[in-house]
Amino acid sequence: LAMAMGDAVADAQARAMAAAYAIAGKEKEKLKQCFKDMTLAAIDYAKHKVEKHLFKCI
């Protein structure tokens, strides 16, 4: 059951991505840049959290 649920989620994600790309069309580059920016922001945020935690420990 858990595997079936996982497959359903993966399928839904794949369909959502396909739809997003189909809608985006020529916007694909902008979409890629957006994902890149979000990833970098997430990394910066995680680093900041880790550093803050480190300073608390010291």
Swiss-Prot record:
Superkingdom classification of source: Eukaryota
Practical and industrial applications: Neurotoxin that could be considered for development as an insecticide, since ingestion at high doses is toxic to both Drosophila (D.melanogaster) and blowflies (L.caesar). It is not toxic by ingestion for bees, aphids and weevils (S.orizae).
Example GO molecular function: toxin activity
One term under GO cellular component: extracellular region
Keyword Methyltransferase appears in the UniProt entry: no
Record localization: Secreted; Target cell membrane
Keywords attached to this entry: Cytolysis, Disulfide bond, Ion transport, Membrane, Neurotoxin, Secreted, Target cell membrane, Target membrane, Toxin, Transmembrane, Transport
Tissues/organs with expression: Expressed by the venom gland.
Residues of the propeptide: 1-24
Intrachain S-S bonds: C34-C57
Keyword Manganese attributed: no
Family per record: Belongs to the formicidae venom precursor-01 superfamily.
Additional record remark: Negative results: does not show effect on the activity of Kv1.1/KCNA1, Kv1.3/KCNA3, Kv1.4/KCNA4, Kv1.5/KCNA5, Shaker IR, Kv4.2/KCND2, Kv7.1/KCNQ1, Kv10.1/KCNH1, Kv11.1/KCNH2, C.elegans KQT-1 potassium channel, and sodium channels DmNav and BgNav.
Free-text function comment from the UniProt entry: Neurotoxin that causes irreversible rapid flaccid paralysis in blowflies and honeybees upon intrathoracic injection. Causes a quick and irreversible cytolytic effect (at 10 uM) indicating it possibly acts as a pore-forming peptide. Shows only weak effect on aphids (A.pisum) at high doses 24 hours post intrathoracic injection. In vitro, is not cytotoxic on the dipteran S2 Drosophila embryonic cell line.
Protein known as: U11-myrmicitoxin-Tb1a
